[in-house]
Amino acid sequence: MLRKAFLMALAFALSSSAAFAADVPERKSLQVINDITKQVRQYTRYTIFDDVSIRLEDNGNAVLTGKVTMPFKKDDIGRLVGRVQGVSTVQNDIAVLPVSPFDDELRFRISRAIYGNSAFWHYAAMANPPIHIVVENGRVTLAGVVQNNVERMLARSLATTFGAFSVKNELKTDAEMKETLEKL
């Protein structure tokens, strides 16, 4: 008798949890992307010398691309993203930058020039500044978000003065980012 009552209670619990799961709406892509972005930005070892991009596919697969300075960052970020509700799998295509004293020196010089410029002081005071400086084999990529096109051009101008082989400017303005998010 006790076993029968237990089985009935278990069946009721399972059926009610299945019904509850059916009532919960599926999370929207924008919500999931915002949660993934929050996880990456709050990762304490994510710096201005790293850049990670996120693409969320319809099946809940999160595709991570970009470049980080240390191998453990790639693994940690992949694990953090995998814990986000709405992410079914993580495809971690983040590349690890090679170790190079020349690249390190270039990173520090460019970051001092950009964040030391009075036009960018308000960014430098942020916990996670929005301009990311990725240096790979002497080639610089500026990524992130700035307020307007003038700041984008100034950042590029400051980055070109330190002997980099090339400077690729992938900075986006607030307006461009807003437009991109509205398409989601």
Could you say what each language-model-derived stretch is?
Residues 2-8, 14-184:
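N-terminal targeting leaders
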